[in-house]
Amino acid sequence: MILRIAIAIFSAVLLLACTDSAPTEHEVSIAYLKSLCSGNHYRIVDDYIIRGVVVATDWLGETNKSAVVVDESGGLEFAIDSRDISRRLPVYSRISIFCNGLMLSRVGGKIELGAPPTGDFPLGSINDEMFDRYIRIEGVEENFTAPTKLFSEISIGDIGNILRFDNLHIAEADGEVRWCDTLDGEVVTTYRTLIDKENNTLPLRTLSTCDYALERMPENEISAIGIIDYADDRYFLRIVNKMIIQ
């Protein structure tokens, strides 16, 4: 009898210890996480986890020290400063981001994720020393397909997400126009204009750091896959992974 009581007490203590020490983690959607940032910034203090597919990094210079992760609810850009981002965070890898301790901030009209700021910029970067604490590679998404939309169907929920657009022409393309202009011998970030089959337009933004900045733009009809951004009261597209389909 005494032995049974002792075993019961030991089991209860062990269960209590496990309950107290094990953190409660909650998997949430990207859309839910972004909804927490109702102001200019939000410090995450709960054990939220988001899981998704990496669809863009700065490996081709198309983004600036950032990556984009998407799930079925939408997309989220997060600030990352790594010496070898293409190795540590391959495109189309499936990842988990452990968000407790990170920060959501409104940057240029959209919500981004990153580390708490250390300077004047509203968001810090997840650096190599922080990487393993916050990001875990779960595998590879071998059959990722970006959703297809028309320009007229873009909505606020698409900001940060990857989308595909078909039957496009580039308004400025004449066989000689490059993705980026030069000014005083320096390549500069440039906006062009995409036109779809309904004759609607969408600005296309290409960073000066892009690997193909000085390549000629296609004159013929294309499909383009990129990230929807928002700034200055307008949507625009950033092509990722050089996904220009002719």
Question: Across the structure, where does each feature detected by a protein language model lie?
Answer:
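OB-fold nucleic-acid-binding modules
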Residues: 18-246
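Sec-dependent bacterial lipoprotein signal peptides
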Residues: 1-16
